[in-house]
């Protein structure tokens, strides 16, 4: 059995596999694999988390398992997922581990690994960990145990790294920025980065209590940020998700700037334009058309930052991302980093001396509707003939004018129904029709 999904191991806390007992076994299994593959007698792992209350329990269990396997652990505390990736490299660790369920509600949690290079752990090592989980847990001789220490300057190290990706001769002195931290991992470091670069920062949702992460805030709920930017007379707004690997922005008029807009800015407005951009099957057709006009290459990957990264490496490109706000700039960071992505947009604003809304003038997304159909149990929509017939009928209706995309979430029991086309009302009607078809078939199944 494989416990690893598209983004590590994820689920509801207290239910397998997100339990303290499993986390202990996982830490031990991962520790045994790392000891076999490490040139060091006692390899080092860095361990961080977001602000979920359950993260503290999982952290204790994981570090106990790792220590029992003879691995040293550096505890980083609550920090963005990309910070863990960076510090894995900066501290010369053999691996990094993040406890987070990203944009999911507080009752979910997850565990994912980074390699020593700060990238997602190779599938081969995940498979080795899976095999090790089938074995009995046994304790090393006391002299061979590892131990855990807390890294007290982890926040400062990451803040300085983020600032290093912003041109040293630029500053943000003339900008007022509203930052929505989603009560998540960037609640402290996020506002600090922009303040230290000179911006006047209004911080929102930066008081995590362990249960309020992503609750009606952050990149998945930007409505209050849009309102706050206008109320504060700010130049722009920035919203992270719970682990700060996603970012969306808001211009001074309260208009949403999503991942497609950000990719458009980085690909067409920056001084150093990339050779190509990787989007996903969810990327708006308007982005593809705009990049073609700008003579910038464009390819689509499957949904998920690991697939975007894979396509970037295959093409030798550095810029890619998703409409949800996962933005990769591989010349700056090894993984999607919300703070660094926002800094790259701010760099373009400063170098062009333009407001955020001016950078997207003339770029208009095709009407697109995404309906998330939450189910009691996951099903494969393409295994049901009646649904396939509905999908085919919709594709024929939009032929040459739009597209549909029906896919299963890799992290939760959700079917995502996306419809895109040149007629907004038609798109809305068709998306709801297909979502209702999925719901009705799920009840039958």
From Swiss-Prot:
How many and how are cofactors bound here? Answer: Binds 1 Mg(2+) ion per subunit.
List the disulfide bonds in this chain: none
> A cellular component term (GO) from this record?
cytosol
| Catalysed reaction equations from the record | alpha-D-glucosamine 1-phosphate = D-glucosamine 6-phosphate
| One Pfam family named in its UniProt record | PGM_PMM_III
Q: Which CDD domains does its entry note?
A: GlmM (cd05802)
Instruction: Give this protein's Gene Ontology molecular function annotations.
Output: magnesium ion binding; phosphoglucosamine mutase activity; phosphomannomutase activity
Q: Any idea which residues are catalytic in this one?
A: 102
Per the entry, what this protein does is: Catalyzes the conversion of glucosamine-6-phosphate to glucosamine-1-phosphate.
Per the record, the similarity remark reads:
Belongs to the phosphohexose mutase family.
**Protein name according to UniProt:** Phosphoglucosamine mutase
């Amino acid at each position: 059995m494989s416990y690893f999904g598209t983004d590590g191991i994820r689920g509801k806390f207290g239910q397998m596999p997100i339990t303290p007992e499993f986390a202990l076994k996982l830490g031990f299994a991962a520790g045994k694999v790392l000891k076999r593959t490490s040139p060091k007698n006692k390899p080092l792992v860095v361990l961080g988390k977001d602000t979920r209350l359950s993260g503290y329990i999982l952290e204790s269990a994981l570090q106990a398992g790792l220590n029992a396997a003879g691995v040293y652990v550096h505890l980083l505390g609550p920090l963005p997922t990309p910070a863990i990736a960076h510090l894995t490299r900066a501290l010369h660790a053999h691996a990094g581990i993040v406890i987070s369920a990203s944009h999911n509600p507080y009752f979910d949690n997850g565990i994912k690994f980074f390699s020593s290079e700060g990238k997602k752990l190779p599938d081969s090592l995940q498979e080795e960990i899976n095999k090790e989980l089938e074995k009995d847990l046994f304790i090393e001789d006391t002299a061979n145990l590892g131990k855990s220490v807390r890294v007290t300057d982890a926040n400062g190290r990451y803040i300085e790294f983020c600032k290093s990706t912003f041109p040293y001769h630029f500053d943000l002195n003339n900008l007022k920025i509203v930052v929505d931290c989603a009560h998540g991992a960037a609640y402290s470091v996020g506002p600090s980065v922009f303040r230290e670069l000179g911006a006047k920062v209004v911080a929102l949702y930066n008081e995590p209590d362990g249960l309020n992460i992503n609750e009606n805030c952050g990149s998945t709920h930007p409505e209050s940020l849009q309102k706050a930017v206008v109320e504060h007379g700010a130049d722009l707004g920035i919203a992270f998700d719970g682990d700060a690997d996603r970012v969306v922005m808001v211009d001074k008029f309260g208009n949403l700037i999503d991942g497609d807009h950000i990719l458009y800015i980085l690909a067409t407005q920056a001084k150093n334009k990339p050779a190509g951009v990787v989007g996903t099957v969810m990327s708006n057709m308007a982005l593809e058309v705009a990049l073609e006009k700008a003579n910038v290459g464009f390819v689509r990957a499957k949904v998920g930052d690991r697939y975007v990264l894979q396509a970037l490496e295959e093409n030798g490109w550095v810029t890619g991302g998703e409409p949800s706000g996962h933005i990769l700039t591989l010349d700056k960071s090894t993984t999607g980093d919300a703070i660094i992505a926002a800094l790259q947009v701010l760099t373009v604003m400063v170098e062009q001396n333009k407001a955020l809304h001016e950078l997207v003038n003339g770029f208009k997304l095709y009407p697109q509707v995404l309906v998330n159909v939450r189910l009691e149990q996951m099903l494969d929509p393409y295994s049901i003939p009646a649904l396939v017939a509905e999908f085919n009928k919709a594709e024929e209706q939009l032929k040459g004018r739009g597209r549909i995309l029906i896919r299963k979430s890799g992290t939760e029991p959700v079917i995502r129904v996306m419809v895109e086309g040149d007629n907004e009302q038609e798109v809305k009607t068709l998306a709801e029709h297909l979502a209702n078809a999925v719901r009705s078939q799920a009840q039958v199944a």
